[in-house]
């Protein structure tokens, strides 16, 4: 391995990323990972996961569009239904393949070189998010596979959550993990109350810490995006949590009262 080899691969990865050639960007960063035996710089990591994010999110958006169209085709008993379903299944496989490739890189290469908690939190967030993405696109009948992935996602998220106390309340990796974990709880696990409580707690702690510190402008911008997403979710979820609490209260009122047996 020479410095020129590394510089050349990084240069090509940069060019590909700027040109929107995300498959090629991943390929060159993979080669860098091999040259360094799993080690990776912050820039290379950003190039790698930015490319995975673009490739995966583009297909997730396409999947949602086709899924909505498929519902219409089913309703209209269209002769094109098999083709539309075929497109959706192809997208499902593409998303799963990209995710499996990314997780394989994390588990087999990147995690072996991690020596700080922030990176461990980051990788646990990415793995948890990717499990959530697969759960979202699996058919309803794949209940067993979904349940297994829910357990895996919970496990991945909790690895990072257990390390969160070692990071500052204004650490964007920490806040990002907590934000995405609450989305997982709300949308996948249907645990509305816990999602709301964690989101609100994260929002309050972050806002309190912001007032106490002078932040770098770039950090402030990143943090501001996360805080606004938390705020939006808290606002959207509050009505559901309120309704759930009311339903629970009504159920308690309707339950039979305990009657003590009369003394003899």
Task: Please describe what each predicted stretch is.
Residues 130-135, 177-189:
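Hydrophobic/aromatic-rich effector regions of fungal transcription factors
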Residues 39, 111-115, 166-170, 208-214:
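Short coil/turn linkers that connect adjacent helices within long alpha-helical scaffolds
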Residues 33-34, 193-211:
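TPR/TPR-like (Sel1-like) alpha-helical repeat modules
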Residues 152, 194-202, 246-252:
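Alpha-helical repeat scaffolds
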Residues 133, 137-173:
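Alpha-helical adaptor scaffolds
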Residues 169-175, 188-198:
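Short conserved catalytic/interaction loops centered on acidic-Pro-aromatic/His motifs
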Residues 1-129, 133-139, 148, 159, ...:
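N-terminal alpha-helical interaction modules that lie
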Residues 119-126, 169-184, 219-232:
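Amphipathic alpha-helical protein-interaction segments enriched in hydrophobic
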């Amino acid at each position: 391995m020479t410095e020129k080899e590394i510089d050349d691969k990084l240069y090509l990865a940069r060019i590909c990323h700027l040109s929107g050639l995300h498959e090629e960007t991943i390929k060159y960063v993979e080669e860098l990972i091999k040259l360094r035996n799993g080690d990776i710089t912050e820039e290379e990591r950003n190039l790698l996961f930015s490319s995975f994010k673009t490739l995966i999110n583009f297909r997730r958006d396409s999947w949602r569009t086709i899924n909505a169209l498929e519902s219409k085709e089913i309703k209209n008993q269209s002769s094109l239904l098999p083709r539309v379903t075929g497109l959706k299944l192809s997208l499902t496989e593409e998303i799963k393949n990209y995710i499996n490739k990314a997780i394989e890189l994390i588990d087999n290469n990147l995690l072996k070189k991690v020596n700080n908690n922030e990176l461990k939190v980051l990788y646990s967030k990415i793995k948890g998010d990717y499990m959530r993405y697969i759960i979202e696109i699996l058919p309803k009948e794949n209940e067993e596979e979904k349940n297994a992935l829910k357990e895996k996602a919970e496990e991945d998220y909790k690895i990072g959550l257990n390390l969160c106390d070692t990071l500052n309340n204004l650490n964007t990796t920490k806040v990002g993990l907590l934000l995405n974990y609450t989305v997982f709880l709300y949308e996948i696990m249907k645990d509305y109350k816990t999602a709301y409580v964690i989101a609100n707690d994260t929002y309050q702690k972050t806002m309190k810490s912001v007032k106490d510190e002078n932040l770098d402008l770039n950090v402030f911008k990143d943090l501001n995006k996360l805080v606004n997403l938390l705020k939006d979710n808290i606002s959207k979820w509050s009505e559901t949590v309120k309704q759930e609490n009311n339903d629970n209260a009504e159920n308690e009122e309707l339950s039979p009262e305990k009657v003590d047996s009369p003394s003899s």
